[in-house]
Regions:
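Nucleotide 5′-phosphate-binding alpha/beta core
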Residues: 1-104, 108, 185
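Short, flexible loop segments at the rims of nucleotide/cofactor-binding pockets, characterized by
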Residues: 89-92, 117, 138-142
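Conserved AMP-binding loop of ANL adenylate-forming enzymes
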Residues: 104-137
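Active-site glycine/GP-rich loop and adjacent strand/helix microenvironment
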Residues: 1-17, 135-272
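Conserved ATP-dependent adenylate/AMP-binding module captured primarily in the ANL superfamily
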Residues: 98-112, 147-159
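Hydrophobic alpha-helical segments that mediate membrane insertion or helix-helix packing
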Residues: 81-82, 113, 132, 243
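AMP-binding (ANL) adenylation modules
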Residues: 32, 119, 268-272
């Protein structure tokens, strides 16, 4: 890949249009030439496909609606989102970018990671699992639920990092300490899913109460990791992603600002 992300996006989108008739039809209808992408302004002309429309296209032309730009034999997994929408995933190292989050959090060789995200149909569990392995950590594939059993696992295996929703992390930590005592709690790192409300205040309380550092990322089933925390304020955008903040009605790029209801549009560097 080149050092110019826009050049790589142009090459990838041009190649994809020759392999995916659904994508080519959308480009043609919008008068969009992917080979001419060289800036963020060019990406702003890219026709956006909403999930609702993709669902209809997949029902009419299963399984992927004409948008698969790879040889079917190269598809490693097919994830399923509500609808259902089928999302093909090629084999990707590092959990499609989640290894960057683990590295930022200081998780690596010698750590025991309890991964409580779902492992079936959706990508969360598998991507986190792959990323933890990529940085050299040992993974316990806990999955969803079984609080008492997972609390015992934490106490008896010396788990040092937990990947979980905020609510489930709290349930696990309380169960471990109440059942096995504070000395059984060896967890130092928590990679948490977000919650409504003042989530940052809740995280600060978790850090103080349970002696952990908390970390988070922004990701989707389609792209994997988009941005992640690195210890400073805010999020760092994955180096292979271009993120736009757009007005959902007009599609125009807007400056970030508090109190606005906007949407993210993300383009990714890829090899085809």
């Amino acid at each position: 890949m080149s050092s110019d992300i826009y050049q790589d996006i142009a090459s990838a989108y041009s190649a994809a249009a020759t392999k995916a008739p659904g994508l080519k039809a959308r480009f043609d209808a919008a008068g969009f030439d992917p080979a001419r992408v060289s800036s963020l302004a060019d990406l702003s002309r890219l026709p956006v496909l909403k999930k609702e429309e993709l669902l209809k296209l997949q029902r009419a032309n299963p399984p992927f609606g004409g948008f698969l730009a790879a040889d079917p034999k190269d598809v490693a997994r097919i994830y399923v989102s509500p609808g259902p929408i089928f999302e093909p995933a090629l084999q990707g190292g590092g959990g499609h970018g989640f290894d960057l989050l683990f590295q930022a959090a200081g998780v690596g060789a010698g750590d025991v990671v309890l991964n409580t995200w779902m492992y079936h149909l959706v990508p969360a569990g598998l991507l986190i699992d792959e990323a933890a392995h990529a940085v050299g950590a040992t993974v316990i594939p806990g999955g969803v639920g079984n609080r008492e059993l997972q609390a015992q696992i934490i106490a008896e295996t010396g788990v040092t990092a937990i990947c979980a929703s905020t609510a489930f992390f709290l349930a696990l930590s309380e169960t471990v300490i109440n059942t096995y005592g504070r000395d059984a709690w060896k967890v130092k790192t928590a990679l948490l899913g977000g919650e409504m409300g003042d989530w940052m205040a809740k995280r600060r309380k978790i850090e103080a109460d349970y002696g952990v550092s908390t970390w988070a990322a922004y990701a989707t089933a389609d792209l994997g990791l988009i941005a992640y925390e690195d210890g400073d304020e805010g999020y760092v955008v994955h180096p292979d992603r271009v993120v736009q903040i757009c007005d959902p009605a007009s599609g125009d790029s807007v400056a970030p600002g508090a109190g606005q209801s906007n949407e993210f549009r993300v383009a990714a560097r890829a090899e085809l």
